[in-house]
Amino acid sequence: MTQHDVFVATEYPAPVVRAVIEVALGTAFQPSHGPEPVPALTIGPTKVFFHDSHPFEDDADFAVSRYRYWVNVEDSARDQQRQLAIAQRVFDAVKAEGWPAMLSFGLQGNLAVYP
């Protein structure tokens, strides 16, 4: 399944960034259960995962090293329109805070970048 991702650059601590996303999506992150537990929230069949960091490096079409946080959005029903709509809400929320952000699809370049 291909996912949408939002990368965020800010010096604010993770709880502040998560709180902005929670307000935008109207629900709270909960600890996820897995080998690498990361905070996650659920909106219907769509899950939003918040990572304090990411393992990605820059390439020609994907300059990601400037971003500190990684928000991964995946829809278990494979509804890419719903998945994109939720990722866009996350992107818009962090953009409204004035934080640099990038919205991508499948980690293959960007759909939107701010600023």
Segments (PLM) and residue ranges:
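Short, intrinsically disordered low-complexity segments
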Residues: 28-77, 114
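Short, flexible beta-strand-to-coil junctions
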Residues: 11-12, 72-79, 106-108
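A short linear-motif detector with a strong N-terminal bias
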Residues: 8, 28, 47-52, 80-83, ...
